[in-house]
Amino acid sequence: MAISNTNLLQTKKPISLPLLAFITLFLMLLNRVNSSDSLSFTFDNFRPDQRDLILQGDAKISSGGDSLQLTKTDTSGKPVRGSVGRALYYTPLHLWDSSTNRLASFQTTFTFVLSSPTNNPGDGIAFFIAPPETTIPPGSSGGLLGLFSPDNALNNSLNQIVAVEFDTFVNNNWDPSHRHIGIDVNTIKSSATVRWQRENGSLATAQISYNSDTKKLSVVSSYPNTQANEDYTVSYDVDLKTELPEWVRVGFSGSTGGYVQNHNILSWTFNSNLQSSRAKKEDIYIKRYV
């Protein structure tokens, strides 16, 4: 018995408008996930054969492969004077989009240990953001933390670098009168600081976040395994789009001068998100369905 095509067509139910809207919304959300420019990585520890880090100066992966050692030690493991080392993640970060003027948000968390054989440690570490081609400035050991040359350390018009420093030695020319965590914007003189009590040889944690909507750079640090039980917090309002180029690299720097300590990073995670112009347009359509 023959069945007419007309009857077959009549038995098919049309797709309902709510279902069509749901499918459209789902496809937009799926597309939006792929419309952001993000950088994400995690180091639970560091391997001697690490290939996704750029090591500069005296920085190296410890022989045991458990930490990133920023400054030099002698054969007995004691820190030496006048050492500078930096480590940067190999893949550049798209910090802002010149075609849309949109700016990325990011968050990074790391653990570190600073240890010294004396009660006068120097000089500290910094998490920093700089142009992709950045290298160690000449003469930047000691209080300059491997970030600035002596000639332009206090001239913010000659630098492109934003850093969060964990400073253990007071340099009277630019530091407050105590050990501190500071936010540096194109100069070694911090724009915002908080007094910081360094715990020799203890594990420290730090979380640094940037909100692209509020333009606020925030820092929280603590020593979770000590009796201190104190969070050190500092923040600063800064438009990174006006201070840094569109593409940058992120990393760590450490230095010793006349006084010394070991500077070791034990773990590091980083996550950023830069929404594209396509995702912004899709947000408008998504709101119509929600």
Curated annotation (Swiss-Prot):
<keyword id="KW-0732">Signal</keyword>
<protein>
    <recommendedName>
        <fullName>Agglutinin-2</fullName>
    </recommendedName>
</protein>
<dbReference type="InterPro" id="IPR001220">
    <property type="entry name" value="Legume_lectin_dom"/>
</dbReference>
<dbReference type="InterPro" id="IPR013320">
    <property type="entry name" value="ConA-like_dom_sf"/>
</dbReference>
<dbReference type="GO" id="GO:0005537">
    <property type="term" value="F:D-mannose binding"/>
</dbReference>
<feature type="binding site">
    <location>
        <position position="167"/>
    </location>
    <ligand>
        <name>Ca(2+)</name>
    </ligand>
</feature>
<comment type="function">
    <text>Bark lectins are storage proteins that probably maintain stocks of nitrogen during dormant period. Self-aggregatable molecules that can bind their own carbohydrate side chains. They could also play a role in the plant's defense against phytophagous invertebrates or herbivorous higher animals.</text>
</comment>
<feature type="binding site">
    <location>
        <position position="171"/>
    </location>
    <ligand>
        <name>Ca(2+)</name>
    </ligand>
</feature>
<feature type="glycosylation site" description="N-linked (GlcNAc...) asparagine">
    <location>
        <position position="155"/>
    </location>
</feature>
<keyword id="KW-0325">Glycoprotein</keyword>
<dbReference type="InterPro" id="IPR016363">
    <property type="entry name" value="L-lectin"/>
</dbReference>
<dbReference type="InterPro" id="IPR050258">
    <property type="entry name" value="Leguminous_Lectin"/>
</dbReference>
<feature type="glycosylation site" description="N-linked (GlcNAc...) asparagine">
    <location>
        <position position="200"/>
    </location>
</feature>
<keyword id="KW-0106">Calcium</keyword>
<feature type="binding site">
    <location>
        <position position="165"/>
    </location>
    <ligand>
        <name>Mn(2+)</name>
    </ligand>
</feature>
<dbReference type="GO" id="GO:0046872">
    <property type="term" value="F:metal ion binding"/>
</dbReference>
<feature type="signal peptide">
    <location>
        <begin position="1"/>
        <end position="35"/>
    </location>
</feature>
<comment type="similarity">
    <text>Belongs to the leguminous lectin family.</text>
</comment>
<keyword id="KW-0464">Manganese</keyword>
<dbReference type="Pfam" id="PF00139">
    <property type="entry name" value="Lectin_legB"/>
</dbReference>
<comment type="function">
    <text>Mannose/glucose binding bark lectin.</text>
</comment>
<comment type="subunit">
    <text>Homotetramer.</text>
</comment>
<feature type="binding site">
    <location>
        <position position="175"/>
    </location>
    <ligand>
        <name>Ca(2+)</name>
    </ligand>
</feature>
<feature type="binding site">
    <location>
        <position position="180"/>
    </location>
    <ligand>
        <name>Mn(2+)</name>
    </ligand>
</feature>
<feature type="binding site">
    <location>
        <position position="175"/>
    </location>
    <ligand>
        <name>Mn(2+)</name>
    </ligand>
</feature>
<keyword id="KW-0479">Metal-binding</keyword>
<keyword id="KW-0430">Lectin</keyword>
<feature type="binding site">
    <location>
        <position position="167"/>
    </location>
    <ligand>
        <name>Mn(2+)</name>
    </ligand>
</feature>
<dbReference type="InterPro" id="IPR019825">
    <property type="entry name" value="Lectin_legB_Mn/Ca_BS"/>
</dbReference>
<keyword id="KW-0465">Mannose-binding</keyword>
<dbReference type="InterPro" id="IPR000985">
    <property type="entry name" value="Lectin_LegA_CS"/>
</dbReference>
